[in-house]
């Protein structure tokens, strides 16, 4: 006769499913023991089959009788947290929004020691800096390089953003919208992180005498197709050359809208004169100091990450050969798997 209360069929199925899915083998053993006892096996047989002591089976029976299946689950390893974890994580998230200087400290950046001091001052706890360091990832806080910016707000930002959103909403085959920008290609490689053996820093050979080349690119906001032209100077002629390329490529378009930054070549007399002669083109200037508005910036970042960082080219023609191959294979962007393409 079973020595535990009868287990319903649905509950037995849930217990069997938990045994199959759980990664906790001790929890699986306890569930198996209860199912064997329900089947009518003796405690001695269960202990022998599961390689455990009879006293352990008796303890599991008490847990199951008092709390059901939940009572058989394993407790977390280690001792319980001594301090209010959630409350302290909330404080950490609020503190990192400010600078230590806001609280009278001379440091410009937070350290774990300083965070621990401030948390202890607010809560009255006695946290160690090492504990704060372990808790930071759980609070969603990571160590990252900051990005420079200016506290200058474009007074016409809302109007410009409204015009950009309206153009994007109306994007179609007859009215395509492009993100446009220029990028500098340097012969001297940009230095970036790479996988390397500990203590053996990689060396990147540089030509020494730098050379430059410039690309003007347009990213179709709908299809992700990339169009670009190159030149030896970043001038109005380069921008106009790209406009001519778009005009020839999208002959059936009734209007062509470009979202550009406020660089001088986009507003020069030469550019304005060409735009007057080609009313098909419409230029929308993004808000000042808002590069994230222009999605073609992501394309240039991908170009640098894929080609120009740590490159081994000794001459500009070798580097430009790789750059042109990248620009030919990057469409549609994003999603073209440019990082896996072969030469």
Swiss-Prot record:
Protein's UniProt keywords contain Cytoplasm: no
Record InterPro entries: Homeodomain-like_sf (IPR009057), RNaseH-like_sf (IPR012337), RNaseH_sf (IPR036397), Tc1-like_DDE_dom (IPR038717), Transpos_IS630-like (IPR047655)
GO molecular function, one term: nucleic acid binding
UniProt entry tagged with the keyword Phosphoprotein: no
Keywords, in A-Z order: Transposable element
Superkingdom in the source lineage: Bacteria
Protein name: Insertion element IS630 uncharacterized 39 kDa protein
Organism (species): Shigella sonnei
């Amino acid at each position: 006769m079973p020595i535990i209360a009868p287990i319903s069929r649905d509950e037995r199925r849930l217990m069997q499913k938990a045994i199959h899915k759980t990664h906790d083998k001790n929890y699986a053993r306890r569930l198996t023991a209860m199912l064997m006892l329900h089947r009518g096996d003796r405690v001695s047989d269960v202990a022998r089959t599961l390689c455990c002591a009879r006293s352990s089976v008796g303890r599991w029976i008490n847990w199951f009788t008092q709390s059901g299946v939940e009572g058989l689950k394993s407790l977390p390893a280690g001792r319980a947290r001594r301090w209010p974890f959630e409350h302290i994580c909330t404080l950490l998230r609020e503190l990192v929004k400010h600078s230590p200087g806001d609280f009278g400290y001379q440091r410009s950046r937070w350290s774990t020691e300083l965070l621990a001091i401030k948390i202890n001052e607010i809560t009255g706890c006695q946290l160690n800096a090492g504990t704060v360091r372990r808790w930071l990832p759980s609070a969603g806080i990571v160590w990252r390089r900051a990005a420079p910016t200016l506290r200058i707000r474009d007074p016409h930002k809302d109007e410009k953003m409204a015009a950009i959103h309206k153009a994007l909403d109306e994007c179609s085959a007859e009215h395509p919208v492009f993100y446009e920008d220029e990028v500098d290609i340097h012969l001297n490689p940009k230095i970036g992180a790479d996988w390397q053996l500990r203590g053996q820093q990689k060396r990147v050979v540089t030509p020494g005498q730098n050379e430059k080349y410039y690309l003007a690119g347009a990213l179709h906001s709908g299809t992700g197709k990339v169009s670009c032209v190159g030149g030896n100077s970043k001038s109005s002629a380069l921008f106009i050359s790209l406009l001519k390329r778009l005009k020839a490529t999208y002959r059936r378009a009734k209007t062509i809208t470009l979202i550009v930054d406020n660089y001088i070549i986009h507003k020069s007399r030469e550019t304005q004169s060409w735009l007057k002669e080609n009313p098909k083109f419409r230029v929308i200037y993004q808000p000042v100091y808002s590069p994230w508005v222009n999605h073609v910036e992501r394309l240039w970042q991908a170009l640098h990450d894929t080609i120009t960082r740590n490159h081994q080219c000794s001459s500009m023609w070798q580097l430009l050969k790789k750059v042109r191959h990248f620009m030919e294979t990057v469409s549609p962007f994003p999603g073209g798997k440019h990082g896996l393409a072969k030469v």
